[in-house]
């Protein structure tokens, strides 16, 4: 909605400028004529009374002006008391009604101070009473409308009738008829009476025309009270008229909003408008909302895993119970090792394995044959031990069970029957050097088996090198190496290079 503040301000400034220009055109010639007449009359008085000089005439005019400012009648032999009780009552009414004619005003400091506090409490009280009086007349108008509707008059006609009666009654009683009364009592013409009526009812109160203060007039005893009551009724009518205008503007504004709402609803219900809104929505979707972009959650590793699981569930068909195309062996991925070849991870930092441990490890891998007793002993705990757990890839489980994978419930796979041996090195040989030395030792062992047999005699099986490779992984090719060749490789690696 457009802000109406600048528009109203511009309208007020324009209205003031137009009014000032019109008043200047209408009143300035009269002021110039009055000024010219004043100087002409002064010269005429000086010629008529030659003994009176210019200074004497100015002193007389100053005295007269000061007396008029104090509220004293400067013409005639009779004086008018503006501060007796009836006239003071009219002055008090002009204070609390905010009319303020200005023809009579307090002259003493005490009177001026009392006028301030009197108006401070009297103005709100008077405005409240005038508002209540206006509501009273509004209630009478409402009852008149109800009476008309009961007589069979339509609601709209009853409203129009009450409004017309209200406006005509106010205009007649407060603007049209009073000037005739003032023509008789005050000696004004009709324009002056109409002017005074409007200036008084609108609380402008210039004070150039005031009823009931002419000292040469012979007023009725109730005339001043009649004028005061007329002022109060006129202010109540004006208050009701302003409230009616405000309510009328409010109703008009509501009607305009209601019409706009209906027009908008009819526009949205039409197929052409829907199509236009869809086109507008498609074009607006291309705009980037920076706030939603900044508040977008960053994807983490868990989110990516969940997305992979959802994709696997979708590709598996959603309702199938069989394995889907995962990353495990069932989905065409990497094959899983059988339980017999699952490596055993043993980490020993400074401990040297004994000969019995080496023999047991080689026998378990099939490099050394076992005796029947040893096979029976080795087979006994295997039969009594529970079946080994079969671990499956989490993504394969997702595709089989068709359920999303919660990354928080994932636990790493721990193989309890592994055969990978990690031997810590203190000498610091790298994996590449170890692999090269192992290859050279294997070639040397095939060329000189006798040298390897001689080196087997002084072998102490209770000691293992602490400077071997840091990582050793057993594969299928190593499982076929005989026991003697392994011992030859071991002796070759531990023997000094010079021998």
From Swiss-Prot:
Organism annotation: Homo sapiens
Domain of life: Eukaryota
Catalytic activity: K(+)(in) = K(+)(out)
pH dependence: The homodimer is gated open at pH > 6. The heterodimer with KCNK16 or KCNK17 is gated open at physiological pH range 7-8 and increases current conductance at alkaline pH without apparent saturation.
Topology in membrane: Multi-pass membrane protein
List of residues that carry Phosphoserine: 371
Glycosylated residues in this chain: 77
Topology, Cytoplasmic side: 1-7, 134-157, 251-325
Full protein name: Potassium channel subfamily K member 5
Biased composition (Low complexity): 466-480
Gene Ontology cellular-component terms listed: monoatomic ion channel complex; plasma membrane
Designated gene of the protein: KCNK5
Family: Belongs to the two pore domain potassium channel (TC 1.A.1.8) family.
């Amino acid at each position: 909605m457009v802000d109406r503040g600048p528009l109203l301000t511009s309208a007020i400034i324009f209205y003031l400028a137009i009014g000032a220009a019109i008043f200047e055109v209408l009143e300035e010639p009269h002021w110039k004529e009055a000024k010219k007449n004043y100087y002409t009359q002064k010269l005429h008085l000086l010629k008529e009374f030659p003994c009176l000089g210019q200074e004497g005439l100015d002193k007389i005019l100053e005295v007269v002006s000061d007396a008029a400012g104090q509220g004293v009648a400067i013409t005639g032999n009779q004086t008018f008391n503006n501060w007796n009780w009836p006239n003071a009552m009219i002055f008090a009414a002009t204070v609390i009604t905010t009319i303020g004619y200005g023809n009579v005003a307090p002259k003493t400091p005490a009177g001026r101070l009392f006028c301030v506090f009197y108006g401070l409490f009297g103005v709100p009280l008077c405005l409240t009473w005038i508002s209540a009086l206006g509501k009273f007349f509004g209630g009478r108008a409402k009852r008149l409308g109800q009476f008309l509707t009961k007589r069979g008059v339509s609601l709209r006609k009853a409203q129009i009738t009450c409004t017309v009666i209200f406006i005509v009654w106010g205009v007649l009683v407060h603007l049209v008829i009073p000037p005739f009364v003032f023509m008789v009592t005050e000696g004004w013409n009709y324009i002056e009476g109409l002017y005074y009526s409007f200036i008084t009812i609108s609380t402008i109160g210039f004070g150039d025309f005031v009823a009931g203060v002419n000292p040469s007039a012979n007023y009725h005893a109730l005339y001043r009270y009649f004028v005061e009551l007329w002022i109060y009724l006129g202010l109540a009518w004006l208050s009701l008229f302003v409230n009616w205008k405000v309510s009328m503007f409010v109703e008009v504004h509501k009607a305009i909003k209601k019409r706009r709402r209906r027009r908008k609803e009819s526009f949205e219900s039409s197929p052409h408008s829907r199509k236009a809104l869809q086109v507008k929505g498609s074009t607006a979707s291309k705009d980037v909302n920076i706030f939603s972009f900044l508040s977008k959650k960053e994807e983490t590793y868990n989110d990516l895993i969940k997305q992979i699981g959802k994709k696997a569930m979708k590709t598996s068909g959603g309702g199938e119970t069989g394995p889907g195309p995962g990353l495990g062996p069932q989905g065409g991925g990497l094959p899983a090792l059988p339980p017999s070849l699952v490596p055993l991870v043993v980490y020993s930092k400074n401990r040297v394995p004994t000969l019995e441990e080496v023999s047991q490890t080689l026998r378990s891998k099939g490099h050394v044959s076992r005796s029947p007793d040893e096979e029976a002993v080795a087979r006994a705990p295997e039969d009594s031990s529970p079946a080994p757990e079969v671990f499956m890839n989490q993504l394969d489980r997702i595709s089989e069970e068709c359920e999303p994978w919660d990354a928080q419930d994932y636990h790493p796979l721990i193989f309890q029957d592994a055969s990978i041996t990690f031997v810590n090195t203190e000498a610091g040989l790298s994996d590449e050097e170890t692999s090269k030395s192992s290859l050279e030792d294997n070639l040397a062992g095939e060329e000189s088996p006798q040298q390897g047999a001689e080196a087997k005699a002084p072998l102490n099986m209770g000691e293992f090198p602490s400077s071997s490779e840091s990582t050793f992984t057993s594969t299928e090719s190593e499982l076929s190496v005989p026991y003697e060749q392994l011992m030859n490789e071991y002796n070759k690696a531990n023997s000094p290079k010079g021998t």
